[in-house]
Amino acid sequence: MGGTFHEQVLPPWHRVVLKIGSSLLTGEHGRLSDAHARRLARFVIASRAAGREVVLVSSGAITAGRVVMTTGGLVAGHGRGHHFAHRQALAALGQTRMIALWQGLFDRPLAQVLLTHDDLRNRRRYLNARATIEELLRYGIVPVINENDSVAVDELTFGDNDNLAAFVAGLIGADLLLVATDVAGLYSADPHADARAQPVDAVRALTPAVLAMATGTASTFGTGGMRSKLEAAQKAAAAGIDTILFNGRDPEVAELLIRGKLRGTRVYSPYSRRHARTHWLLHAPASPGGIRIDAGAARALRNGGASLLPTGVTGVAGAFQRGDVVEIAAVDEPLPIARGITQYGASELRLICGCHSGAIRDRLGYTYGSAVVHRNDLVTLPAAMRGIAAGVQVHA
């Protein structure tokens, strides 16, 4: 094996997702160990002190559950067990041990967030998951996220926490995905089998040739190998997010991260985050309904990059749910001028249209926020697309 990974400067960031694999939380005899996690926790603490946000995606629950079952002398009773159910039982048994390991490394409360694939497929649950994580970050709490293995359906799992981390990065609009593993990064070939294998510092495009460099073998305690990590990086790249794969066992990793540097493989996204989001909003199917807004709100959307507030809404057409993509038309204009993800369903919006944001709770008894459509979830339509995008005429 020739060469070493070069030290790289991290791109500017405010929010990152840091994924830690089972192998970094496992010591002798397969028991949980905080030896490597302690260094990564120092980076999280230093980031919080600097006003930055780190969301942890941590494996280790199944590994911890296996240890508890073995050392506790737990023996199954009569009847035939099921492999997937056994895995779920291990996750349930080990989840508290895994979160306790992390809590012992911080002087402030952590929050455990368990997600299933269905949480991100269902738009309302997707928005609720995002809102929960955003609220935790607003209070300075570090979310520790894992797949809810205990209730996940076999055919609807993320497969491994590499993929979960990529989904979470897209969910919360992370600036960067950091994947801590037990190898230094991607090599041109298997470094254990080929002495000519060279470290790959940068991947500009995840071509079949690049994917072929990765072996699919997982570590003893994990489920995702290098192939899985590149597939996760591919998902993050589609959302405009770069991924860096690095060695979490490196004794200098905390100091490097705190100084804004790393040694490893950086997988570049061909898109900016804004470009990826805009492209999706422009081409996602819109619901059979829409929102009519006044001239002032139309000017604010077109010129100021503002959120759409209920005070600017004059009417609602059709039926749509919270989390749907809806088209937005200005008064006296037949075609939509914008589209975005609505925070309120049509029936809710009819009750709050025209009111100030502070009155939403009074009218509904609850609130999903001050905006009907947040500016991060909204795109104005280029003139050439307005006729194409219009799925319905918004009359109200």
Task: Indicate residue ranges for each PLM-predicted region.
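C-terminal catalytic "cap/lid" subdomain
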Residues: 2-396
